[in-house]
Structures are given as structure tokens and as C-alpha cells.
Amino acid sequence: MFRRGDNSNFNVQNSFFLPLEYEYTVKDNVPSKKKSSIGFFPLDDSLFTSKNNSGHHKSEQLHRGNAETIRSQFGTDAVPIRIDEKEGKWDRIQDDNSSNLNYQINNSNDPASSGKYTQSIDCNHIAESKFSKKNGNIDSLRSNSATFMLNTADEDVIEFSFDDNVPYAELLSGATLEKCSLTLNEINKKLFNTLYDFRVSKDNPEENLVELILPNCVVLLNFFEDIELLADSSDEAFEKSTFINTIEFIVHDIWVETLIKNINLLQMFDADLKCYNDKYIICKLKGQYPSTNIVDIMCRLKHFSNSILETFKFGIELKEQDQCHNRNTIINYVLFSRVFSTIVLEIQKCFILIVKFMYSVNFLEKFSDEVFLSFIEILIKIVFEHQIPQLFLGIDEIIQLWLKNNEGKRQQLLSAWCNGTVQDMKQSQQRESSNAESESITSSTEEDEEGLQFNKWDVIEPFIDNIKALNQSKSHM
């Protein structure tokens, strides 16, 4: 599904709803001219903390202070720089702890820039975001030093090791690693750090989810496809909790941060939120975060019961009941549904990439079967609620990966899940048929050639049959 691409000029900025089998490019996703414009923003790590995290993992949580250390690259030299956002100062820290102000800050009040505050450092670009770690540097956990060959479009081939200050962001910006040698745990740590550092921080983050997150996940996938895995030593066991929390971080970035940055779309009808049925969404909009645990997020996604058409219908009902006083409220609900569905879709695409990566390095076997089936259930629900049948292509692929090289238990789990899904669909159809209002909406939609809904059973039935056939073929092998 996700293959290497040849088109270095491929632009994925507006490709929210591309079919998932589309061939994403993995080379030069971020042009060199734009590298310097990619920023990072610190997040309060307390938002990531899950109640289910073990005490051992909590001791390894990453913390940020008010001052963030950034390394700027001058050839092979790296100079730490401290950012004090309150005073607008960039202090270059010398070895003798003295400050040598060698920087340039531009405060732009030009109306053409929409009042945006911009900062620029007199250096090539900000290469890496560094942050302190509670129990020492992750590099100290590595048992040996691996060597890479880094190729970029505008630089000569350079050789470096883990001890050098080569930024993770550079590895994600069109660079390809030709050779390396890592243990399984080192891969886990590297992925964790890379995705933690690389954040969406542009003015319109919802337009950059695919542009920044997905291509870099693809780069990671292709990078890890070619690595040589070393056997983990007895004292360096694979840390499942760290990998699961890596996924939580990705979801948190896309889900929470993007939704919060789009809160301006909802301020116009904030008074009408009390009429909105989804309490979880209201909770999110008010800035309350019940949990960032991946399983909790999956479960709460089920409670979003409004497709675009259903949201529009709900707005009309409010109008008829005089609960809203102008048609702008209806339009705002539709706008919010579009933004929300886009965010959800990008989360699902990221999950497909993550699951594919997990399989490529044998992580899929370590992933909880219950979490996996919850993930599949969420994907199917998103297909129905947001009318994205192309997503079935990705669902089918990751199910096949999940079943591969695993006989017995997973086949039984999948068979039981399919039977339960079919039963739920039949019960749902019976409820819809007994509801006169639902019947009228369905009939009117079927008459409209441009209707937003499709017959759910016509889609899910062959899909379930496909899975059952696949399941049977696996069980007979």
C-alpha cells in the first residue's frame, strides 16, 4: 500500500482524502528551502501521562522547561542555544557559562504578515530540538555506536555516529540512511525520540498533518526496512510501554493540538454547545483532557455519532426548535464536522503506518490483540460515519499483517469479532427500519445521486466475507 515513490515534487498538502493506496513519496518531502521554517513547540508532558503507565516508564518521561535548548548546525559543529520566549532573547551558551549574544531577531509588524511574530537566527537553520530527560540521556542506554551514511540532495555524503550531533529532523527531511546496525530496543528509542521531537507547529496545522507527519512516518518505515536488527542483550529488553506511548504522542499531537488550534471555528457557536449531544467533544473543546491513553481515545471516538449529513440535520432541528437564531450556526456545525473528520482521518492514516512499521520490525506480535481489534473497529466506524470507503483497503492490509505468522488464537478472535460485527450491523438495520425518520432520510439520500451516505451493509458484508475467507485460508495452512 505504501511504496517508495519517485516524484520528488509531490505535494501532499491538500491530500486529506486521498485513497490510502496512493503512492506517497518518501524523498525530499520537505524541500531544503523550507527546512529552516519548520519549527518545534514544547508540550507539557503531563498531558501525555497515562494512568496505565508503569512506575518504571514514568521515571523515563521526558520533561521540558521554560527554556528550550536548540542546536544549530554549522557543518559538523553544534552550538547549544537557549531560548527565553518571555524576553525574546537567544543566548548562545559558551563552555564557560557566559552568554555571547550573537543573534538576529526580527519583529514583524507588517500587516501583510497578519501580525505574526517571526524570529530568525543568524545561522543555517535550527536543526534539532533538545530536551532534558529525567533519568539521563537515552544515548547512554545504547550498548554500541552505530555508523550511518547520510545522503541529502544539497549536501555531500557525511558519516556520523550516535555520538555526533546530527539532528533527527535532518533524518526526516528527505535524507536516506544507507546502512546502520541497531538493536530492537535502539529502534524503539530512536523512533520515540524522533516522533517526539518532530511536531506540527505551523499556522494551519490541519493543512500539514499529511505534509509533515505521514511522509516522515514513511521515511521511518523505509529506513527500518533496510536495517540490520541485532539480538537484544539480556539486560536491554524491549520496552513495550515506550512504544505504546510513542503512538500516544502521535495521537496527542494530531488530535488535541490540532483541535485546540481550530477552536476559533467554534467560538461563534459556543453558546450552542450545550445542545450538542457529544459530551466528549464538548469536554475536549473546553480544554479538558480525560485521558491521552490510546485505548481510551479509541473508545471515545465511538461516541462521535455525527456525520456531515447528520450534523447538518441536527443544525436544522435546532433551527426549527428556535434553539439557534441564525443559519450561521448550522454552517458552523458543518465546518466543525469537516475539521473533525479530517483530524480523525489523519489519525487513522498514522495508525496504518504505525501498524505497518510494527510488522516490519516484528512489533506487531507484541501488540495487544484487544487493542488491535479495537483499532479495527474504530476504523470501520470512521468509514461509515465519514463516508470514506477507501479506508477499507488499509483495514484489509493490516488485518492480513496481523494474521500472518500467527495461527490459532488470532483466527479465533477475528472470527468471533466478525460474527459480532455482523450481528451488530443487523441489529442496527432493524432499528433504522423501525424509525420512520431514518427511513425518510435514507430514501431521500438514495434518490439524490450526490448523496453523502452509502449503503453500509453493501460495503461491510463483502468486507466481512473477505476477512472470513482470509481467516479460513490461514487456518487451513
UniProtKB/Swiss-Prot annotation:
It comes from the Eukaryota. GO terms for biological process: ascospore formation; ascospore wall assembly; positive regulation of ascospore-type prospore membrane formation. Residues 432-444 have a biased composition (Low complexity). Residues 428-452 are annotated as: Disordered. Keywords: Cytoplasm, Sporulation. One of its GO terms (cellular component) is cytoplasm. It is found in: Cytoplasm. Required for spore wall assembly and ascus formation. This is Sporulation-specific protein 77. It comes from Saccharomyces cerevisiae (strain ATCC 204508 / S288c) (Baker's yeast). The gene is SPO77.
